[in-house]
């Protein structure tokens, strides 16, 4: 469970335990004065964790989404980046007080900040152009060690959801480090599978199911990334630096050591999307058909809405859950090795 915070709003009088925090900060609670957020103030940060956030964590909040609306720098300490420091402060507090590994969801705070938060890339516009940019954005972030971007799959800002676009966005998200959806509040912006017609509902459910099934592989590669510093999602030139195609196919990426992905980021024409995929040396199995293809070639083929370009390196071993897995929390389900 996570809750969204807007820390820059400070601590207002209507918040639970405001009185205790106001006293800590030398503010008369009767004034109902909002206590401003100051990252560099140790007294403020300690009181906030003790009086405001700590009780909610005891009630079941696992981690915080810091939807920060701040200025760039702290008002009292020169050149202290608000984003960088709040990520550090929250992560360090969890590290000290909890027995579990810290988890934080927030924006990029600059070089070195990859140590702390899972990334929130901001309120994406609902458009094919936004979708087309994200695979490149996702993979190249590994160049600054930032392997955990997450996106508002399907877009956030707009008037309504395009079912095809949303489906393609989810397919990309299922083979990204973090898979989540989010949007503005609106009657035409709901993203639950059942709000779409049966065709799209079935495809969306199958896409989510694929993510569940691949969880053991994703976790294995995430752990390897933690140990080695090589991101789960990375550009092709990491593995094939001598090939010019590794730089030319900007949206193509490796998802772990053995899975090659080329997201579909444009609408279909006559029920199919035409996609060009570069297959590096070796042999590759096409996920949806099982066809074995030789590498060192560019493949162009049509993909229906329920298909997208995923290729598995021949000889790879992929640990996966069985197709009936329903819960990834504390899971001790059987694992199939493919």
Model feature map: region roles:
Residues 1-314:
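Catalytic-domain carbohydrate-binding cleft regions of carbohydrate-active enzymes
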Residues 307-338:
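Accessory, solvent-exposed terminal regions and/or long lumenal/extracellular loops of proteins
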């Amino acid at each position: 469970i996570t809750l969204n915070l807007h820390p820059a709003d400070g601590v207002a009088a209507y918040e639970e335990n405001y009185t205790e925090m106001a006293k800590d900060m030398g503010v008369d609670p009767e004034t109902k004065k909002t206590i401003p957020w100051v990252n560099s103030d140790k007294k403020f940060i300690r009181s906030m964790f003790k009086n405001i956030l700590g009780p909610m964590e005891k009630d079941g909040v696992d981690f915080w989404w810091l939807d920060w609306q701040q200025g760039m720098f702290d008002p009292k300490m020169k050149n202290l980046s608000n984003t960088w420091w709040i990520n550090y402060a929250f992560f360090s507090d969890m590290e000290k007080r909890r027995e579990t590994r810290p988890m934080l969801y927030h924006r990029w705070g600059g070089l070195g900040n990859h140590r702390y938060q899972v990334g929130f890339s901001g309120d994406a516009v609902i458009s094919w152009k936004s979708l087309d940019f994200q695979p490149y954005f996702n993979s190249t972030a590994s160049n600054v060690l930032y392997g955990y971007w997450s996106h508002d799959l399907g877009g956030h800002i707009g008037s309504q959801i395009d079912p095809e676009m949303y489906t393609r966005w989810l397919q990309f998200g299922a083979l990204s480090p973090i898979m989540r959806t989010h949007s503005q509040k609106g009657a035409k912006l709901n993203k639950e599978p059942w709000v779409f017609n049966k065709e799209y509902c079935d495809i969306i459910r199958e896409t989510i199911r694929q993510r569940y099934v691949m969880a053991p592989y994703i976790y294995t590669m995430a752990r390897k990334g933690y140990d080695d510093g090589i991101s789960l999602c990375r550009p092709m030139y990491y593995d094939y630096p001598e090939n010019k195609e590794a730089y030319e196919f900007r949206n193509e990426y490796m998802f772990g050591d053995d899975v090659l992905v080329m997201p579909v980021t444009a609408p279909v024409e006559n029920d199919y999307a035409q996609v060009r995929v570069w297959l590096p040396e070796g042999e590759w199995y096409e996920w949806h058909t099982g066809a074995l293809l030789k590498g060192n070639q560019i493949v162009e083929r049509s993909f229906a809405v329920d298909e997208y370009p995923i290729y598995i390196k021949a000889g790879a071993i992929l640990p996966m859950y069985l197709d009936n897995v329903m819960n990834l929390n504390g899971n001790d389900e059987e694992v199939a090795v493919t």
